[in-house]
Protein backbone atom coordinates (compact mmCIF):
# COMPACT_ATOMS: atom_id res chain seq x y z
CA UNK A 1 0.00 0.00 0.00
CA UNK A 2 2.75 2.43 0.83
CA UNK A 3 4.29 1.90 -2.61
CA UNK A 4 0.99 3.08 -4.13
CA UNK A 5 -0.02 5.86 -1.72
CA UNK A 6 3.41 6.96 -0.51
CA UNK A 7 4.89 7.39 2.91
CA UNK A 8 7.41 5.24 4.72
CA UNK A 9 6.27 1.77 5.79
CA UNK A 10 6.19 1.22 9.54
CA UNK A 11 4.49 -1.16 11.97
CA UNK A 12 1.07 -0.12 13.34
CA UNK A 13 1.28 2.62 15.94
CA UNK A 14 0.12 1.25 19.25
CA UNK A 15 -0.67 -2.07 17.62
CA UNK A 16 0.91 -5.47 17.39
CA UNK A 17 4.60 -5.03 16.52
CA UNK A 18 4.60 -8.48 14.89
CA UNK A 19 1.80 -7.54 12.49
CA UNK A 20 2.58 -7.68 8.79
CA UNK A 21 0.22 -4.74 8.20
CA UNK A 22 2.27 -1.73 7.19
CA UNK A 23 0.92 1.81 7.41
CA UNK A 24 2.38 5.26 7.05
CA UNK A 25 1.35 8.82 7.74
CA UNK A 26 -0.67 8.70 4.48
CA UNK A 27 -1.91 5.09 4.52
CA UNK A 28 -4.23 3.18 6.82
CA UNK A 29 -5.78 -0.26 6.75
CA UNK A 30 -9.45 -0.92 7.45
CA UNK A 31 -10.10 -4.29 9.05
CA UNK A 32 -13.18 -5.95 7.56
CA UNK A 33 -13.62 -8.53 10.32
CA UNK A 34 -16.65 -6.69 11.72
CA UNK A 35 -18.26 -6.43 8.29
CA UNK A 36 -18.46 -10.15 7.47
CA UNK A 37 -22.07 -10.88 6.62
CA UNK A 38 -21.68 -14.65 6.24
CA UNK A 39 -20.08 -17.08 8.65
CA UNK A 40 -19.95 -20.30 6.65
CA UNK A 41 -19.85 -21.46 3.07
CA UNK A 42 -17.71 -18.77 1.42
CA UNK A 43 -14.33 -17.24 2.09
CA UNK A 44 -14.15 -13.80 3.71
CA UNK A 45 -12.48 -12.57 0.51
CA UNK A 46 -15.66 -13.18 -1.48
CA UNK A 47 -17.50 -9.83 -1.91
CA UNK A 48 -20.80 -11.56 -1.00
CA UNK A 49 -19.36 -12.32 2.45
CA UNK A 50 -18.95 -8.68 3.47
CA UNK A 51 -21.34 -5.84 4.18
CA UNK A 52 -19.53 -3.20 2.13
CA UNK A 53 -22.53 -0.86 2.29
CA UNK A 54 -22.26 -0.69 6.09
CA UNK A 55 -18.50 -0.22 5.86
CA UNK A 56 -18.94 2.60 3.32
CA UNK A 57 -21.53 4.39 5.47
CA UNK A 58 -19.27 4.24 8.52
CA UNK A 59 -16.11 5.26 6.67
CA UNK A 60 -17.41 8.04 4.39
CA UNK A 61 -18.56 10.24 7.27
CA UNK A 62 -16.85 9.02 10.44
CA UNK A 63 -18.52 9.57 13.77
CA UNK A 64 -15.48 10.25 15.91
CA UNK A 65 -17.48 9.51 19.06
CA UNK A 66 -17.84 5.96 17.77
CA UNK A 67 -14.08 5.59 17.75
CA UNK A 68 -13.98 6.71 21.37
CA UNK A 69 -16.97 4.54 22.34
CA UNK A 70 -17.05 1.38 20.19
CA UNK A 71 -20.57 0.61 21.46
CA UNK A 72 -21.82 3.33 19.10
CA UNK A 73 -20.67 1.42 15.99
CA UNK A 74 -23.16 -0.83 14.22
CA UNK A 75 -21.22 -4.09 14.11
CA UNK A 76 -22.18 -7.46 12.78
CA UNK A 77 -21.42 -9.77 15.68
CA UNK A 78 -21.29 -13.54 15.44
CA UNK A 79 -21.42 -15.85 18.43
CA UNK A 80 -19.91 -19.15 17.44
CA UNK A 81 -20.16 -22.47 19.19
CA UNK A 82 -17.21 -24.67 18.27
CA UNK A 83 -18.83 -27.62 20.02
CA UNK A 84 -21.96 -27.70 17.87
CA UNK A 85 -20.42 -25.98 14.82
CA UNK A 86 -23.37 -23.55 14.78
CA UNK A 87 -23.21 -19.80 14.65
CA UNK A 88 -25.74 -17.06 15.24
CA UNK A 89 -25.80 -13.50 14.08
Curated annotation (Swiss-Prot):
<protein>
    <recommendedName>
        <fullName>Phosphoribulokinase, chloroplastic</fullName>
        <ecNumber>2.7.1.19</ecNumber>
    </recommendedName>
</protein>
<dbReference type="Pfam" id="PF00485">
    <property type="entry name" value="PRK"/>
</dbReference>
<keyword id="KW-0418">Kinase</keyword>
<keyword id="KW-0067">ATP-binding</keyword>
<keyword id="KW-0547">Nucleotide-binding</keyword>
<keyword id="KW-0808">Transferase</keyword>
<feature type="region of interest" description="Disordered">
    <location>
        <begin position="1"/>
        <end position="22"/>
    </location>
</feature>
<keyword id="KW-0934">Plastid</keyword>
<comment type="similarity">
    <text>Belongs to the phosphoribulokinase family.</text>
</comment>
<dbReference type="GO" id="GO:0019253">
    <property type="term" value="P:reductive pentose-phosphate cycle"/>
</dbReference>
<dbReference type="GO" id="GO:0008974">
    <property type="term" value="F:phosphoribulokinase activity"/>
</dbReference>
<comment type="pathway">
    <text>Carbohydrate biosynthesis; Calvin cycle.</text>
</comment>
<keyword id="KW-0150">Chloroplast</keyword>
<dbReference type="InterPro" id="IPR006083">
    <property type="entry name" value="PRK/URK"/>
</dbReference>
<keyword id="KW-1015">Disulfide bond</keyword>
<dbReference type="GO" id="GO:0005524">
    <property type="term" value="F:ATP binding"/>
</dbReference>
<keyword id="KW-0113">Calvin cycle</keyword>
<dbReference type="GO" id="GO:0009507">
    <property type="term" value="C:chloroplast"/>
</dbReference>
<keyword id="KW-0602">Photosynthesis</keyword>
